């Protein structure tokens, strides 16, 4: 793609309309950071932007991200990249965000602040129950967010069953009978009634960082759910620094039964990884299902 291609011309025109001034004489460079979208740094003498590009059929996926970032921004709890605009051509869809110079941190106080801000996000609740006003994606997998008053039914019907159905279509047959899984799930909630909290939905270390010491999260799979889902995922691919968890628990203590539910919540993400990346995750999914059933 060159700067005079229909795609980049459309991006420049959409930015021009969004900032109400001509966005001209620009350049762009590919940047890393994901396997779902093509990503670029786009800049001219006055502005720098982060641009996600995908096929035209993915415009609603990008629209959901645009809306999710706006919703998180409105909470004033944690920083996210400001979404500027989105659009599509015949072949492509695109999302334009502000450019942030993101860095990892080895400072204890930064991770403590991250824990505090995630806790503040989780204090945002919904009176409508568990779900969101639109479906979105987890990675590129469709994620159903129809509203439920009951968290257990939401997690089974909107999270585990769709992923298992897709996994079976791709050749995965769990070693644990799913009927035993469905029987086990409610037992993990006998003494715990979750509150519908605003959750990031895909909170692993690759979707959080720092900009000049300020915690930033991005690439959301947003919905209102049990806040434990976010904390569980921070532990799935290696825990965050201890200061994150200490600070989170100081501001919003976890229920003592969280450790028992962690495998249930991470099962969703492992099934999704199987559906996205293949059979390497089948063994891990079997182990997590066996853990959940054994707990009950």
Which residues fall in each region the model found?
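A cross-family signal for key residues in well-ordered alpha-helices
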Residues: 70, 235, 266
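Active-site Asp-x-Gly
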Residues: 144-156, 165, 195-198, 205-263, ...
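A glycine-centered beta->alpha junction motif in the catalytic cores
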Residues: 48, 89-108, 123, 157-161, ...
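ATP-binding pocket architecture of kinase catalytic cores
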Residues: 29-149, 153
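Short secondary-structure junctions
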Residues: 22-31, 254
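Regulatory N- and C-terminal appendages and interdomain linkers associated
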Residues: 1-24, 92, 280-296
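Short acidic/polar mixed-charge low-complexity motifs
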Residues: 22, 45-49, 214
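An alpha-helical support segment within catalytic cores of ATP-dependent transferases
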Residues: 6-19, 126-198, 296
